[in-house]
Amino acid sequence: MDYKHNFATSPDSFLDGRQNPLLYTDFLSSNKELIYKQPSGPGLVDSAYNFHHQNSLHDRSVQENLGPMFQPFGVDISHLPITNPPIFQSSLPAFDQPVYKRRISISNGQISQLGEDLETVENLYNCQPPILSSKAQQNPNPQQVANPSAAIYPSFSSNELQNVPQPHEQATVIPEAAPQTGSKNIYAAMTPYDSNIKLNIPAVAATCDIPSATPSIPSGDSTMNQAYINMQLRLQAQMQTKAWKNAQLNVHPCTPASNSSVSSSSSCQNINDHNIENQSVHSSISHGVNHHTVNNSCQNAELNISSSLPYESKCPDVNLTHANSKPQYKDATSALKNNINSEKDVHTAPFSSMHTTATFQIKQEARPQKIENNTAGLKDGAKAWKRARLLERNRIAASKCRQRKKMSQLQLQREFDQISKENTMMKKKIENYEKLVQKMKKISRLHMQECTINGGNNSYQSLQNKDSDVNGFLKMIEEMIRSSSLYDE
């Protein structure tokens, strides 16, 4: 009879060599009839049961009975880890089921799995979405947070942000020249050597005798130019403060003020930055002004500013942007001479645009390499640190496991020695008792024989003989006990 396919006669029904849970005898389940009524094909079984790991936790009766115990925590008891030995699973195999061997000791592989679980828990932070920065969280306007330009220039107003160019356009795009009017004014190209001096227009005009006036720009483009100027000012201030901080960390000695005009100009702009933001930046120079007087006035202003600064601010600013912008300054001066000689109107970009674009280009090229190198080093270091920590944890766990094994072996050896000694003593006692019993049997047998022989004599002499025999028998037993080792114990 085929017990695997005849469900009517089989006490434990099977499906494809395994037990069919749908027809399993369930006396504790309240929905037993619903289970039997579920439609199932010849090879279809309920997906709630895992046949590769048969466990009584998958039985619905066990789930219903144990469910309220885990209900406050929302734990599914069918997903609990199988303990060693299992709690809710009997060690007896079912009908026609192979006996699975269980490993009681824990190995280093399982210890490494525990370490991997801890590592996955620690790596949850890397899987989470990035947290907003503190500036973005403090910004009450959500549109500025969503705008990518707001993350780069967080301190701009809403009307200025409309005209702010994108970061990839900042390094290459130069604003178009404004339409010229009838007045023939020449706007000198600003360099990193004189841009910081000409920020304070009245002071420079007084020293150089250069008339300062606002440029002739149409009223429609004034707001756009003002926003662009403010943006250039703030961007330049931020970049120079970062360069000044890096220079303070890297440069050890300080040189005299005569060799540090670049650093004095940059530090002067950082100090007087709050007085510059609301001033007009365009300056007009007439075509009759000599170029030699302009350069002399700029040098005098640089010397005055460098002499008025404290000694700490005269330290040289180690920044590649100023060194790389010297050829641009020479090109700008040659172009200015040509324009003066030919008496043509030249309208250049707002002040320090050349300096800003140069610095932004260099920063854009140099910074990502440093960031990539730093991040690669940090990632490699973090991985190596985690690997070393995991190996150290596994080594400690393995040493503790070996120590526990050694202690258990020593304890087992001590218990074995003690039990073996007790067994030897008990064996000796048993042997002594057996010898004593054999002697008593012999004496009792002899005494019974004497009693039977003298049983017919009822005289007084026979009674005395019996009493003497009994006393002699007791004395013999006492001597036997004394002679044996049991008397001492």
Swiss-Prot record:
The bZIP domain, residue ranges: 384-447
S-S bridge residues: none
GO cellular component: nucleus
One GO term of the biological process aspect: positive regulation of transcription by RNA polymerase II
Induction: By nitrogen limitation.
Keywords linked to the UniProt accession: DNA-binding, Nucleus, Transcription, Transcription regulation
CDD domains: bZIP_ATF2
InterPro entries: bZIP, bZIP_sf, bZIP_transcription_factors
Entry annotated with the keyword Transferase: no
Subcellular location: Nucleus
Transcription regulation is among the record's keywords: yes
Segments of this protein annotated with the region Basic motif: 386-406
One MF annotation (Gene Ontology) recorded for this entry: RNA polymerase II cis-regulatory region sequence-specific DNA binding
Span list, region Leucine-zipper: 412-419
Family from the record: Belongs to the bZIP family.
Function comment: Transcriptional activator of promoters containing ATF/CREB sites. Can independently stimulate transcription through ATF/CREB sites. Important for a variety of biological functions including growth on non-optimal carbon sources. Regulates the expression of COS8. Has efficient silencing blocking activities.
Protein name: ATF/CREB activator 1
